Amino acid sequence: MVLLHPLLTAAALLGASARAQSVVGTPFGFASGTTGGGNAAPAAPKDTNELKEWLADPNPRVIVIDKEFNFIGTEDTCTDCECCIPDSNTCGDAGQNAIKTEGSDWCGSYPATTCTYDNAGLEGMEVASDKTIIGVGDAGVIRGKGLRLVNGVSNIIIQNVHITELNPQYIWGGDAISLDGTDKIWVDHVKVSLVGRQMFVTGYESSGGVTVSNSEFDGQTKWSASCDGHHYWSVLGYGKGDQITFANNYIHHTSGRSPKIEFDSHWHAYNNFWENNSGHAFDVGEGANVLIEGNVFSNVKTPMNPEDTPGSTFAVNAQDASSCTSALGRPCIANELTSSGELSGNDEAVLSGWPKGEGDTKAMTTDKVPSYVKANAGVGKLGSGGSGAASSSASITPSPTSSAIPSSSATPSSSAYARRHYARHHHY
């Protein structure tokens, strides 16, 4: 009998897993028809440089995230750089100061201060068209850098990946997943935690054909803009003409913008579970059209921000559930609220102009939502057939560099470039 070294055996098994990795489930909602890298041979990049290269190249790819890719320190550190103290930070080190981004006057007259942050987090990795990015089990982690889908890219699947630790101490520290001018994007079974700014954001250019599903937005943080251990900057939709299906997601320990939606867009939010939100969930701005059905809100202080909601919202209750039949081909499901504030919005005009491109959507009743979502949303829960198994995902804790910054610091020119480049694309 030949005995193999345990490390060699583990490496062989992981390699076989990478080769066998494929997307679980089928894109639905506005992202129906998305194929990502299609039949390209699955392959796992060897390091952060190769991951960046593969994401940005023009070839269809199935990119397997079979381990943690840690970008912290890979683009140097900005030491004692310009920052400010916003009015929201009334709790010192437990709050969030803001990075002063060149080209933006966000800091305005706020008191100036200095801060030290990692440059890699400021700008996400650019992802080209026809890509599938898929994690193995709960091992697929991208630490310290997000994903950026812009300039007309299309046909991209992101599944079973945990994105974490993008300068969580600082506003403008980095976005996990950002879209700006895209089409046919499926974000599924993703987890986001410990970010400086947005967990998921669409920029000003239209992002049509997008579905965000079965994902976990974990707002637990030591650096809170609301000074209560909850992350404020969560989900933001700013694209003119966005069409987004937002389904089966778990949004917890946030305090605002969960989501904030603006401009001429259509969002269909159903079968999501909001839990332990100390501020507001929905914030619907002018021009937005939002259909909210079959969701559960538990311990959410303000499910709908009434002070800043001039957009069109139809939040379904039991009395008007049948109104959806003409638009969706089925009755809507009423929302459920427990230990939460009021979910306002009864504008049935949202339905009259509903886009036909979303196709059939199947919603479960709210009594099933909390257990289903908590068992299936996030990483390590793909299971079979896309339904997911009730397994726990890997816990991510900040690396030592979150508080103990690496010794190498960026030159003034490289730090300034990073701040300018970030500000040019991030005014929201």
Swiss-Prot record:
Q: Give one GO term, molecular function aspect.
A: pectate lyase activity
Q: Name one Pfam family in it.
A: Pectate_lyase_4
Residues in the signal sequence: 1-20
List, alphabetically, the GO terms of the cellular component aspect.
extracellular region
Instruction: Identify the stretch(es) annotated as Disordered.
Output: 337-367, 383-428
- Keyword set, alphabetical order: Carbohydrate metabolism, Cell wall biogenesis/degradation, Disulfide bond, Glycoprotein, Lyase, Polysaccharide degradation, Secreted, Signal
TM region positions: none
**What biological process terms from GO does the record include?**
cell wall organization; pectin catabolic process
Q: Which residues form a coiled coil?
A: none
Compositional bias of kind Low complexity:
389-417
User: Which residues does the record list as glycosylated?
Assistant: 276
Query: Where is this gene product found?
Result: Secreted
Q: What is its main location?
A: secreted
Q: Which cysteines are joined by disulfide bonds?
A: 83-107, 324-332
Asked if the keyword Disulfide bond belongs to this entry, the reply reads yes
Give the Basic residues compositional bias ranges: 418-428
Q: What is its EC number?
A: 4.2.2.10
Function of this protein? Pectinolytic enzymes consist of four classes of enzymes: pectin lyase, polygalacturonase, pectin methylesterase and rhamnogalacturonase. Among pectinolytic enzymes, pectin lyase is the most important in depolymerization of pectin, since it cleaves internal glycosidic bonds of highly methylated pectins.
Recorded protein name is Probable pectin lyase F
Q: Which organism is it from?
A: Aspergillus flavus (strain ATCC 200026 / FGSC A1120 / IAM 13836 / NRRL 3357 / JCM 12722 / SRRC 167)
